[in-house]
C-alpha cells in the first residue's frame, strides 16, 4: 500500500521551522517518520508522553488525556488511583469530553454522585472544559493493555457501544 508507506515514512515539513529549532540545519527535503507518538525533549533526551490518537480536541483546544486523568485522580478519594480514562466523542457542534473512573476498593456506590460532582468541578476549573459524561464503574471495568496501561480507545468503543 504505497499511500500508507508514503504517509508513515516519507513525511516532509510543509515549511521551514523557525531558527533555533531542533530541525535547524536539516536539508529541505529531509524526511521523518510519523509514529503517532507525542513527546518532549528535555536536556537533549526524548520522552514519549502519549499518542496523537488519544489527544482530545474540544472547540479547537488541545487537551491531553493524561492531564485530565491526573486532575480526576486528585479530585476524589472515591476514585481508584490510575484507573481513569478520558476521551472525546463526537457531539453536534464540538467534541464532548467523557470520563470513566473506577470506584476505589471498598467504596460504596452511594458515594458516586458526590464524586462525580467533585470531578466535574475539578476538571472544569483546571482545564476549562465541562465533561459531558462522567461514569464511575466497578474495579477492573476499564480496559487495559497487556502491560496494564489504560486502553482509552477500547474504553471509548465500549462506552459508545453502551451509549447506542
Label each PLM-derived region with a short phrase.
Residues 82-88, 98-99, 120-164:
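Conserved C-terminal "lid"/linker of ANL adenylate-forming enzymes
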Residues 2-11, 29-127:
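AMP-binding/adenylate-forming catalytic core of the ANL superfamily
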Residues 18, 24, 53-55, 63, ...:
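Small/flexible residues
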Residues 26-29, 77-79, 138-143:
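Noncatalytic linker/hinge segments flanking ATPase motor cores
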Residues 18, 49, 57, 116, ...:
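General helical secondary-structure elements
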Residues 9-29:
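Surface-exposed acidic, glycine/proline-enriched linker/cap segments
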Amino acid at each position: 500500500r504505497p499511500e500508507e508507506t508514503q504517509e508513515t515514512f516519507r513525511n516532509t515539513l510543509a515549511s521551514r521551522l523557525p531558527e533555533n529549532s531542533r530541525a535547524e540545519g536539516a536539508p529541505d527535503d529531509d524526511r521523518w517518520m510519523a509514529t503517532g507518538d507525542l513527546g518532549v525533549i528535555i536536556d537533549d533526551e526524548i520522552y514519549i508522553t502519549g499518542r496523537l490518537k488519544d489527544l482530545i480536541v474540544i472547540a479547537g483546544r488541545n487537551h491531553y488525556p493524561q492531564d485530565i486523568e491526573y486532575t480526576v485522580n486528585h479530585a476524589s478519594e472515591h476514585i481508584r488511583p490510575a484507573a481513569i480514562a478520558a476521551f472525546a466523542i463526537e457531539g453536534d457542534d464540538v467534541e464532548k469530553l467523557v470520563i470513566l473512573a473506577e470506584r476505589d476498593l471498598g467504596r460504596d456506590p452511594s458515594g458516586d454522585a458526590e464524586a462525580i460532582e467533585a470531578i466535574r468541578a475539578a476538571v472544569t476549573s483546571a482545564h476549562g472544559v465541562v465533561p459531558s459524561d462522567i461514569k464511575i464503574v466497578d474495579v477492573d471495568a476499564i480496559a487495559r493493555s497487556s502491560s496494564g496501561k489504560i486502553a482509552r480507545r477500547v474504553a471509548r468503543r465500549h462506552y459508545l457501544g453502551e451509549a447506542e
